[in-house]
Amino acid sequence: MKALIPKQHGAWAMLLIPFLLGMVKGGPVIWHIPLFLGWLFLYLAVYPVTLALKKKQSKPYQKWMCYYGFPTCCFLMISVFHKPPLIWVGVSLLPLFLIHMYFARRKNERALLNDVAGVLFFCSGGFASCWLGMGTLDGWAWFIFLQSALFFIGSSFYVKSVIRERKNRAFAYWSWGYHLLLPFLSALFGAGWAFLAFIPSSLRAWFFHGRDWPVKTIGILEIVNACFFLAVMCLFITR
């Protein structure tokens, strides 16, 4: 039986990088294991739900909802049992999940608003991870959430502008404008010299637009860019 696993590489980066940043800043603890496993299985569980809504038939995907949903509940319950306030992170994710379900039902899950909702959903993993490691909620959890959100919203803009919206000049201008502001927004939210983590994102949005590259090449470059972002942010938050 072939596992039903999402194939979006960008989503995997959004799943991992904010969580890792939160763990690096907060300090790794044993409770990060169930939290990460719960986070991972939650991501996997959303995929069959999305397909069921998109194709308007749930039966082919019910077993995968159970396979992924059961461990999701178990691992996240362990995390919440250890730190009950984490339940509020889950509550805050509900509107974002409903936005995703709405666009999946309309077979328009590539809409920019849905992308932004997805980015905020994933970046909350860094918020929870930092909170869990530090033991208290402080500005660093918000910092990791905001910086990760800025980065991955930019990635969504860029990828959409060179693939699905490559012939949409207006969308290109929106992407260029966002990436022009991106380093300044990062600094505004407290990044200091770590705004440098966003420079490659801005440069590739301006100079790589219009290149007739295969999707695989674009994906590889995005992974490299995400690794650079992770490295710079790790240096900044551990200084």
UniProtKB/Swiss-Prot annotation:
It comes from the Bacteria. InterPro entries: YwiC (IPR025576). One of its GO terms (cellular component) is plasma membrane. It is a multi-pass membrane protein. Keywords: Cell membrane, Membrane, Transmembrane, Transmembrane helix. Its main location: membrane. The chain crosses the membrane at residues 4-24, 29-49, 61-81, 84-104, 116-136, 139-159, 180-200, 218-238. To H.influenzae HI_1626. The keyword Cell membrane applies. The keyword Membrane applies. It is found in: Cell membrane. Pfam families: YwiC. This is Uncharacterized protein YwiC.
